[in-house]
C-alpha cells in the first residue's frame, strides 16, 4: 500500500510538472492575464540550457573514457559553508541598500496594511472607518499588521528612518526573511547532496529570490518565504536522539502554523508532511506511526487556535471590532478562480458580488452556486483551457509578475544620491532602461529550475530519502492544485521558490552522477576486458604448446 501511495504521488508530480513545462515552452503565445514578454522565448532558453548541460556531460564522458577520473573538488566543505554564510550576510546588506535606493509606495494590499499600521502607532490620528471592514474581510493580514506595527514602534524608539522612509523598518524584516530562506536552501541541500551541488542551488535561489525586486514590498508573499523551507528543514534534519527529533518536529509544526497567518499557502508544507507520515504508517503499520499524523494535526489545530486568539485580542484591545459575518471565505476565492473573464485573478465584480450578502452563510452558498454555474458554462474543454491559462499566469514569469498587478509605483521617492539610486531604479523598476537585463537573467534561471525540478521526479528513492523527497514533491503538487482551484497570482509561487530550487538541485545532481556512474562502469568493464585479454595473451606466449 505504501509503495503504491509513494508511486502515485511521484506520478502526479511528474504529470503536473510535465504539463507546466509543455505550456511554458510551447504555448506561451496563448492569451492570459499578467502576460510579460521576454527577450528570449522559453523554448530557446530551455534549448540553450539543455545544450550547455549536454556538452558538459559529453566532455565529462570523453574525459573519463580517455582513462581519466573526475577528481574530488579541491574546495573543502568548510569553505563552501563559510562562503554560503558570507554571501547570505552580504545579500542582506545589499538588499537593504537596494531597497533604500529604489523605495516607492504602492496602493494595493501592502499599502493598505502599512497605512493601518501607521494609524495604530500614531493612535492620536484615530483609525480610519474602513479599517474594521478591511481587517474583518481579510483576517489573514492580522499578523502581518502586528509585525508592521512592531517594526514601526521599534523604528520610532531607535529613530533610524523618518517620514516616508519609516517603511524601511518593515522592508528590513522582509530582507532578513529572504536572505534567511536562501541560506536555509543551502542547509537543506547539504543534508542530501555534496556541498558543490548545494552551493549551486544556493546561487540559483539568490538570483530568483535574493535579487528579486519583491524584496522591496513587505507583504505576505515575500515575508512568508521563510516558513515553508524552515518547516521542512526542522522536520527532516537529523537529531541526536528521539527527544530532540520530536522537539524539532514540534517546533516545525508551530513555525508552519505561524506562517499560515502570514500566508495561508504555508500550510501546504504541513499538509505534505502529514500525508507522508500517513504513507509511512501504511508501510510499517506500527502504533506510533499511526499516531504521528493525528498528533501533528492535533498540535496544528491547537497552535492555530492559540495564535488566532492572541492576534484577535491584540486588535480588540485597541477598539477594532472584527465582524466574522463580513469575512471572505475560501468559497469566494474559489469563485474568483473560476472567473474566466478575469483569468482567475482578482475580480472587483466578484468582490462586489460577495459584499452584497450580509451573512457569511448566505455568501458561502452564493459563492458555491456561482462557482457551479461557471463550471457548467465553461464545459470540460473550456475549463481545461481556463486551467491552462491559469498555469501560464502562475509559471511563465521568472519575475513573478513584478509590476504587472495593482497600483505599483503610486509614489516614487526622490533619488537619495546622484548616481546609484537612478542606476538601481533603471534595473529594478519594471519600466527601467536596464530592467530587461534583470528579468532575462531571472527568466533563464527560472526555466532551468523548472527543467531540473522535473528531473527530481526521477531521483532514485531509497529508505533514507523517500519520505523527505515525497514531502517536497507533495508540497509542489499541493501549491499547483491550489493555484488551479482558487484565485491565481504569479507572486503566490514566490514563497515556494526555495523548494523548487531544492528539487532542481536534487534533479541536476541525479542526472550528473548518473552520467558519471554509467561512464565509470563502462570504463571499468572496458579495462577489465583489456586486462583479461592481456592475461590470455601472456599465457599463450608462456605456454605455446598448450
Predicted regions and their residues:
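Extracytosolic helix-loop segments that constitute the early lumenal/periplasmic catalytic or substrate-binding loops
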Residues: 111-137, 143, 342-348
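Membrane-proximal stem/loop segments at transmembrane-domain junctions that anchor or position
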Residues: 126-128, 313-418
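Short hydrophobic/aromatic helix or loop-helix immediately within or flanking a transmembrane segment
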Residues: 133-163
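Transmembrane-helix motifs of polytopic, lipid-linked glycan transferases
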Residues: 169-192, 230, 451-458
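Transmembrane-helix signature of polytopic, membrane-embedded enzymes
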Residues: 185-207, 466-470
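Short acidic/glycine- and proline-prone juxtamembrane loop motifs at membrane-interface regions
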Residues: 210-224, 262
